[in-house]
Structure formats: C-alpha cells, structure tokens
Regions:
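Short, solvent-exposed loop/turn segments at secondary-structure junctions
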Residues: 38-39, 111-114, 128, 148, ...
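Non-heme Fe(II)/2-oxoglutarate
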Residues: 2-11, 46, 55-58, 65, ...
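Non-heme Fe(II)-dependent double-stranded beta-helix
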Residues: 1-28, 33-129, 246
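A structural signal for short, well-ordered beta-strand segments
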Residues: 108-111, 141-143, 215-219
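Conserved metal-binding segment of the jelly-roll/cupin
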Residues: 186-201
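Catalytic core of non-heme Fe(II) oxygenases with the double-stranded beta-helix
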Residues: 118-186, 224-233
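Active-site lining segments that contact anionic ligands and/or coordinate catalytic metals
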Residues: 182, 189, 210-214
Length: 251
C-alpha cells in the first residue's frame, strides 16, 4: 500500500481541502481548522496525558527530549488509545500530501504543556536547515487540547516565512524577541493548526497560568528519518488496533 492508497482508505481526497485552505498553505504556510477534534475526544486526551504525567513526571518526553517549564509526553500513540483519533484528522492528512506531494509517514507525536510563567520559545522552524521554497520535508500540527488564549502561551507564527529560504536564527538578532510580522494564534480547544515545518513559529509565555496542552503530530517524507523511529517503539497493542492504512503511514 502506498500513501495515496492509504489516504483514500481514510477518506482523504483532492477535495478534502478547500481552495482557500490550499491557498493559505501556499501563501501563509499554515491554516487553522476549528473543531478538528470532538469535545469528548480531546477531554479524554487531556485526562490520559495528565495520568501519564503523574507517572513520568520530569522524565516525560524522554524518548525525544525533556523541557524545563513545559511537561512533555512523547511516544503517545504507543502509550494510550485515546490519542488514536489524531490519526483521523483528514485536513491534516490532506495538508501533508498537498505540501509534501509524495510518499510520507508519521514523523513524531508529542504533547507539550506550558507551565505558568514558562513556555516562551525562540521563533524557530521544525526542520534543521533552510530550504528553497517548495523543497519541504515536514508538515507539523498543533492539536489544541486546551484553548489558545492571548495570555496562556499560545503560538506565534510569522505568515509567509516558509517562502523566505531562511531560518530565523540566521536573520534575527534574538529569536526570543517579537517579530514585526508575527501573529498570535487564538482558538478554542479541539482546533488544529496545520503548518509547513519551515514556517517560523514559537510558543509564548504562559502569563495567566491556564492549562495549555497541545499535541504536535508531524509527518515527513518517507525517505527522511523520523523524530522517533516508530518501529523501534511499536507495541503489539498499537499494531493490532491499527488498520493497514494507519500502519502504512506509521511506517
């Protein structure tokens, strides 16, 4: 089974994205989808994340990396069935195919929770080098388990920056500073921000102290390395409950 066949089996086709959404990906490097997850789905994910965090504590995210001031979870698909619905978000799958335009697979799955008074990130990209426009390798997403508000650590994005062929650290004096063209993404829980990994973005300071749990589910070119090699961590439980289409995309 190839990627296109897998997407067809999951109900994704050329009409999944509207012309306006495709234009947003082309011009801005991101789109916002509201109601990407049902309330009962993200409520279960919040509960499961918190339960796993009680066990993993400061080690949470160890499979990829840990972060002071932002509790993390990595390898979530192997740890809980509640996160499976993320693999069914059709606009995300369609966007990955639209941007990458060839065979792709899951790159990584992480959850990040910016703690009160923490969470500020440098503006960055999620790909390790600058690329020419069109030479894209990763599509990332922010799946909001809590609302993004102006003061709880919402993401800032620089629209159109994926077309620059540059990385923020190469042109900004300090990527922690505000960028003159950045916008703050505010949206209700269940929303999904889909972004080209070369679009400049970063988390902001959680001033209010409200919860700000967000899933990062990314897809990469099939021949590129995964953030977490799925076959090294694949459990029998995940293998048994995944359809052939899902297994194809998990690689």
């Amino acid at each position: 089974m190839n990627t296109k066949q897998a997407l067809n089996n999951l109900g994704v086709n050329e009409d999944t994205l509207s012309p306006e959404q495709k234009q947003g990906l082309d011009q801005d490097g991101f789109i916002l989808i509201e109601e990407g997850l049902a309330p009962e789905a993200y409520a279960k994910m919040c509960h499961r994340f918190d339960k796993i965090q009680e066990v993993e504590g400061e080690k949470g995210g160890w499979e990829v990396h840990t972060e002071a001031g932002a509790p993390r979870l990595s390898n979530g698909l192997n740890k809980a069935t509640e996160f499976d619905d993320c693999l069914e978000i059709r606009p995300l799958l369609a966007s990955a195919y639209y941007i990458l335009a060839t065979e792709f697979k899951v790159h990584g799955f992480n959850i990040r929770d910016a703690s009160p008074g923490r969470g500020q990130q440098r503006i960055h990209t999620d790909y390790g080098r600058a690329v020419e426009a069109g030479d894209y390798h990763i599509v990332n997403s922010l799946i909001l388990l809590d609302p993004f508000t102006p003061d709880n650590g919402a993401a800032r994005i620089v629209p159109g920056s994926h077309l620059s062929g540059q990385r923020p650290e190469d042109v900004m004096d300090d990527p922690l500073d505000p960028h003159p063209d950045e916008i703050l993404i505010t949206a209700p829980a269940g929303s999904v921000v889909i972004l080209n990994a070369n679009t400049w973005h970063g988390g902001t300071l959680n001033v209010s102290g409200e919860r700000r749990r967000v899933i990062h589910l990314s897809y990469c070119l099939r021949d590129d390395p995964q953030q977490l090699v799925q076959q090294d961590f694949l459990t029998e439980g995940l293998y048994q409950r995944m359809s052939p289409a899902h297994l194809c995309l998990l690689d």
